[in-house]
Amino acid sequence: MKKIIALLLVSLMVCVPSISYCAPADIIFDIINREHSTNSSRAMELLYSFKKSAKANKDNKEPKDVKIIKNEKELNEANLQKGKIQGTLIGIDVSKWDGNINWKQVKGAGIQFAVIRAGYGYTRDKKFKRNIEGAIKNDIYIGIYWFSYAYTVDMAVKEAKVCADIIKPYKNEIDLPVYFDYEYDSVDYAHKQGKSITKVLTTNMADAFCSTITSYGYEAGIYTNLDFSNNYFGKSVLEKWQIWIAQWTRTNTYKKTDYSMWQYGAKSYVKGIKGYVDMDYFYGDKYEKKN
């Protein structure tokens, strides 16, 4: 597996002429007129779009612990820090619903990692091969997620095995965890099958999926949000595995356990992707502490 080098997030603000405020770091977008961007290194510049609604501008907030990389010299120095993530990376999570992604443009927009859906239930995501190979080609760090429709522990184990089989050709290119994604849609599906989903069952399924994934040599984690974690995941499993928390608010109020990734927005724009895309921060220091 290639080592994760220390790329620290560039936290920038872009002021758009004739617009009364500077765009916040909640949305990355391509600004066609390049003179509107800052003078930072093109390789690291983040181009932020703006929203007209003042309320919308408060949706997300960049983390306070982000270190600003001002030039290529600092970037090269950061790359030498023991092959570990030392700060905060900015990334996206994608699936077939994001269409045909231009990964070269995504990389150029400043995206440093992508969590790619490998599949759901027992089914491969139709865009998985295209997405992961595009990310690899453009030196974007890779994580995986699997949307679960399991309603027994055995089903969760089988999903993990199917996932491991699908991602096997790219094992050495996967830098971040493989995440178990279980949501209210998963619960609704189980109910339609006449199955009851309890907190104990969901906790056991998550643990079974993650344990199975780690047996194949991957790091494992759980995707969740504050409400779902309170209702369906026991604290023991949340403490055991890497946590990817979804909270589309200005600040993250999840305090149940440590988390190493935060999905902070779902209506963002990134050059190379048509329509909205989910945005994430990956906290390297927290990730290192939990391993």
Q: What annotation goes with each model-predicted range?
A:
Residues 84-108, 112-208, 214-216:
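Substrate-binding cleft of extracellular glycoside hydrolase catalytic domains
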Residues 8-16:
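Bacterial N-terminal signal peptides
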Residues 15-31:
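Sec-dependent signal peptide cleavage junction
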Residues 1-4, 8:
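Positively charged n-region of N-terminal signal peptides that target proteins for export
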Residues 213, 217-231:
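Aromatic-lined carbohydrate-recognition surfaces of secreted/lumenal glycan-active proteins
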